[in-house]
Every structure is written in C-alpha cells, then in structure tokens.
C-alpha cells in the first residue's frame, strides 16, 4: 500500500468514526433509588387483611402518584418461612402482588421469577397475614426487574423511548455492568433507576448515588 492509499484509508476510518459518533447516545447519569420489598393490594385484599371498609393511610409520597402507606403485613412462603413488617404501597391496584429480592425469595423458600412490576401471570404463590385476616395469592410474588423511570423530556434528549433496554455502569471499586435495564417513560416520572437491595449491596450503592447509561 503506497502513501496515498495509507492516507485514503486513514481518512476513511476517521470519517466513519465521526459518523458513528453522531448517532451515539449521550452518556446519561441517573440517580439510584433502592427498592425494598413491598406489597401492592387490591381494595378487596386490603379489607381482608385490615377489616371491612379499611383504607390505606399515606406515610410518604412516591413518584408516579404512588405512596408508601403506614400499613404493613407479614408475608409467608410455602415452607411457612415468614418476613414481617413488609410495607404496602398505595393506591390500590387491580391485582395484588408482592415484590421481593432474590435473597428474600431464598429466605421464604419461594421460586419468584424476575419480572417487571405488574407482570405476575404464572409467578410464585405467597400468603399475606394482616391484623384482621390472611390471604393466599396463587400467583403474585416476583423479584422486581431493574428499570429506569424517565420523564418524556429526558427520554427525548437521550434518544430513548418507553420499553428500550439499556446497559448501566454502576459503582466504583466493586461496581458492575448491569444489562437488560428497561426504560420506562411517563409524564409522572422523575429520572431515577430502581434496583433492589441485593443489587445495591453488590455494588456498594446507596440511594442518591449516580449510575451511567452506557
């Protein structure tokens, strides 16, 4: 290859790299929110656990119109292993579900699949015990899949749409690259990535720390 061909080849490589750079999404920093085990209930199940006509009472506001309630109950696995004081989130939903970590699943002795919230078809059974009664869910116990909440304005700037899957670099010395992180876009959201306690502990992260979308 002569000098002219060398220059031509290098020029072509540079132009291709520049063109690729134009389509590359910007590196977005996202604050972390650590999601502890929690419960979503139908109004019918609220009343079974807490009494007829009972309404959940608000403890603190969460994004997306949700709130952490003052109410808690005990969850019980198939081998009668229990975890007490699991918080209930409101408002009530059309189907009851329990979201736990993989460590919780082992503690309870349940085979909870990793799913996005609301995707409970064929998931693990679980029992819930409240002050006024108990319920048994034939399905509804899941390990919540990691995801990023993003308002439309941020999604537009970053070039993402609802349902996109991304990779995220998290942590420093004991950091990790998490793949298959789902982008969820909604007007009610603020920018935040939700991970469970297992993932946070593995990367030594705390609420408010930032991760980077790759």
Q: What is each model feature region?
A:
Residues 172:
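Acidic, glycine-rich active-site loops and adjacent beta-strand->loop/helix elements
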Residues 1-24:
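Short, low-complexity, charged amphipathic interaction modules
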Residues 31-33, 38-79, 84-131, 136-163, ...:
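Short beta-strand-centered segments at strand-helix junctions
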Residues 175-177:
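Short coil-to-beta-strand transition motifs
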Residues 26-30:
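Short structural boundary motif marking the start of a folded domain
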Residues 212-214:
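C-terminal edge-of-domain segments
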């Amino acid at each position: 290859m002569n000098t002219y061909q060398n220059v031509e080849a290098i020029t072509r490589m540079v132009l291709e790299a520049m063109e690729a750079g134009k389509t590359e999404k910007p590196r977005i920093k996202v604050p972390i929110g650590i999601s502890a085990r929690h419960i979503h209930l139908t109004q019918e199940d609220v009343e079974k656990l807490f009494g007829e006509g009972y309404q959940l009472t608000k403890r603190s506001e969460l994004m997306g119109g949700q709130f952490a309630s003052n109410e808690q109950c005990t969850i019980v696995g198939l081998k009668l292993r229990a975890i007490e004081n699991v918080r209930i989130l409101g408002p009530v939903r059309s189907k009851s579900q329990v979201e736990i970590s993989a460590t919780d699943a082992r503690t309870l002795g349940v085979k909870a699949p990793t799913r996005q919230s609301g995707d409970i078809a064929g998931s693990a059974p679980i029992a819930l015990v409240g002050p006024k009664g108990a319920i048994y869910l034939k399905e509804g116990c899941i390990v919540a899949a990691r995801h990023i909440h993003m308002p439309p304005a941020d999604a537009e700037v970053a070039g993402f749409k609802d349902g996109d899957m991304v990779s995220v670099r998290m942590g420093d010395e004991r950091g990790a690259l998490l793949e298959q992180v789902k982008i969820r876009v909604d007007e009610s959201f603020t920018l935040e990535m939700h991970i469970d306690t297992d993932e946070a502990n593995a990367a030594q992260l705390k609420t408010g720390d930032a991760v980077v979308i790759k």
